[in-house]
Design a protein with these regions (language model features):
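Alpha/beta-hydrolase active-site loop
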Residues: 84-105
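Mobile cap/lid helix-loop segments that gate and shape the active-site cleft of serine hydrolases
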Residues: 5-8, 131-149, 155-157, 167, ...
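Short beta-strand element of the alpha/beta-hydrolase
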Residues: 29, 39-49
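Short amphipathic alpha-helix adjacent to the substrate-entry channel of hydrolases
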Residues: 57-75
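Gly/Ser-rich "nucleophile elbow"/oxyanion-hole loop immediately N-terminal to the catalytic nucleophile
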Residues: 101-117, 136-137, 153
C-alpha cells in the first residue's frame, strides 16, 4: 500500500517482548497497527531521554497519530546507560530493524520499507544505526533461530530513511553546551553513556563524517527547533551540510 498521510485508519495497540538484556531486563516493543488492507510501511520509533531515561511510551501521541495515517509504528525499549553504556542501545536498535524485517508481516507491515524515527538521543542512535547498518559492534546480537531448530533468517539492518527531532548529531558539542550552561544532570548523562569517554568521538556522527569513514547514506529528515538551547541549531546545520557534502 502506498502511503497517504491524509488517510485515517483505526489502530490496534499491542505489546510483545523484543529481547532480554544481559542484565535480565525484558525490552518490549509497542506496536501501533493500522486497521486496513495494507501492507503498511514500517516505522521504528527510538525514544529520547539523554540515553539514560524514558522508554517505549515516550512518543505515544505521535506514534498513534502516525499509525492512524497508515504506518505500522513500532516503539521499542532500549538499554539505558546505567545498565550498559554505548553501544548497547545501538545494538538494540540494530536488532529491532532485523527483527522487524522478519516479523513485520505478522502485523500487516511491509518489511521491505522500514524507516526510523528518533527523538534527541534517539536521533543519535538512529543516525549511527543508519550510517553503520553492518557494523559488527552494532549487529552483535543475533536473531533467534527459526522453528524446528532452523538457522536465524539472514537479514541486515539497512533502513529506507530516518526522520528525527533535535537529534544529538554532535554529542561532544552538546556536552560542551551543557558545561557552558552548568547543566550538571545533562553532563552526567553524557559521562554515563560515553564510557570510556573516548567513545564520544568514535560514536559522534559529525566526527564520523569528518573522518571520511565509509558509511551508508540514506535520506535524513531533521526537524530542529530554532530556539532550542539543548541541541543548538548551528550545530545541527553544520551536521546537515557535512552529511550533504
Amino acid at each position: 500500500t502506498s502511503y497517504n498521510p491524509s488517510a485515517k485508519f483505526d489502530i490496534t495497540v499491542s505489546e510483545v517482548p523484543l529481547r532480554t538484556t544481559a542484565a535480565g531486563r525484558t525490552l518490549m516493543a509497542r506496536i501501533y497497527q493500522p486497521s486496513g488492507p495494507g501492507p503498511f510501511p514500517v516505522l521504528l520509533d527510538l525514544h529520547g531521554g539523554a540515553w539514560n531515561n524514558k522508554d517505549r511510551h515516550a512518543e505515544e501521541p505521535m506514534d498513534r497519530a502516525l499509525a492512524s495515517s497508515g504506518l505500522l509504528v513500532v516503539a521499542i525499549d532500549m538499554t539505558l546507560a546505567p545498565e550498559a553504556p554505548y553501544p548497547a542501545c545501538v545494538q538494540d536498535a540494530n536488532f529491532a530493524v532485523r527483527w522487524l524485517k522478519v516479523n513485520a508481516a505478522k502485523w500487516n507491515g511491509d518489511a521491505s520499507k522500514v524507516g526510523v524515527y528518533g527523538s534527541s538521543s534517539g536521533g543519535h542512535v538512529a543516525e549511527l544505526l543508519a550510517m553503520r547498518p553492518r557494523d559488527p559492534r552494532y549487529n552483535a546480537i543475533p536473531l533467534p533461530g527459526g522453528p524446528g531448530g532452523n538457522a536465524a533468517p539472514k537479514v541486515d539492518a539497512t533502513v529506507a530513511f530516518v526522520a528525527m527531532r533535535s537529534p544529538v548529531s554532535n554529542p561532544l558539542a552538546r556536552f560542551q553546551n551543557a558545561v557552558d550552561l552548568k547543566r550538571e544532570p545533562m553532563m552526567n548523562n553524557h559521562k554515563v553513556f560515553f564510557s570510556p569517554w573516548d567513545s564520544i568521538h568514535e560514536s559522534n556522527p559529525q566526527e564520523i563524517l569528518e573522518r571520511h569513514e565509509k558509511v551508508t547514506f540514506v535520506p535524513f529528515l531533521i526537524m530542529q527547533g530554532a530556539l532550542d538551547d539543548n541541541v543548538r541549531p548551528a550545530v545541527q546545520e553544520t551536521f546537515v551540510k557535512t552529511y550533504q557534502a
